[in-house]
Amino acid sequence: ATLHRMTRSSYPDACRRRSQASLPLFLALLLSALLPVAAHAWGPKGHRLVAGLASGELTPQARAEVARLLRGEAEPTLAGVSNWADDLREHDPNLGKRSARWHYVDLAEDDCRYRPRAHCRDGDCVIEAIIRQRGLLADRRQPDAVRAQALKFLVHFVGDAHQPLHAGYARDRGGNTIQIQLDGKGTNLHRLWDGEVIASADMNERRYLRHLQRMPLPAQARIGIDDPAAWAEASCQFVLRDGFYPAHAKIEPAYFSRWRPTADAQLRIAGHRLAALLNDALKTGAGKP
C-alpha cells in the first residue's frame, strides 16, 4: 500500500473556495487549525474499553494486585483510571507537561520503522514510556504510590500505542494539521480518530464492550506481545494505507464504515496486550533482580 499524501490542492474545501462554504464554516476550519490540539487517543470511551477488555483477561493474582494498588481511587478499576494520564494537565499540570510526549511516537514516513535515536530522544515517547512504567510496576521494592502511578500510566499508554495517529508522522503532527469537515463543522483527522470513529458505532460503553469481547482475537495480537515498538510500528502501517488520509475534506459515512472495523480490532488487540503486560508484571517475582 502507498500513503495517500494530501496537499492543500487535494481539497475543494471551505478554506480554499469560500464560494462553496459559509463564513462560519470557514472560520471554524481556520480556528481548528490555529488552536492547540489535545492528544486524547481513542477518547475517554475508547480508553475505558481497552481497560475493560484487559480486566476480563487478568489472572487472579494480577486482579488482586490491581485492586490493592488502586484502593482509594474514586473508581478503583482499570477503566476508572484509564483516562488519568490525559487528565493530568488539570489535576497535576507539572506531571502533565513532563509526560506530554509519552503519549505518542513520530515514526519514519513511508516505512514506519522505529529508530530510537531519531524518534525517541531522551526516552520521551510512548514506546519507552511503556517500558519504563512496566519496570516500575513490576518492581516490588518501589513504594505503592509509585507502582500505582505506573499502573495508571500503563493502562492509558498501551491504548495510545494502538491508535494509528499516535504512531504517525511529525510532518502533520499525527494528523492534527489535516483539516476536515464533519457534519458541517471544522475539525482535524487526529480528533476524528480520537473519538468520532468510535462514536460512529452508536453504542454505549457497556454494549460496545460486549461487542468487542465477542470479536475473535485478531491473529496479530499475539505478535510482539511484549514489544511496544512492534505495536507502534503495526499501528503506523494503517496510516500508510490508501484511504486512511481522506481524499476530500468532507468526511462521509463511508469513511467510518471502512475504518471502524480497524479501530475495533485495534481496541481488541490493545486490551489483550494490556492484560498480558499486567499479568506478567504482577506475577510473583516479576520485579526481582
Question: Which ranges hold each PLM region?
Answer:
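Bacterial N-terminal signal peptides
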Residues: 22-36
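N-terminal, motif-rich segments that launch catalysis or mediate targeting to/interaction with membranes
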Residues: 40-157, 164-289
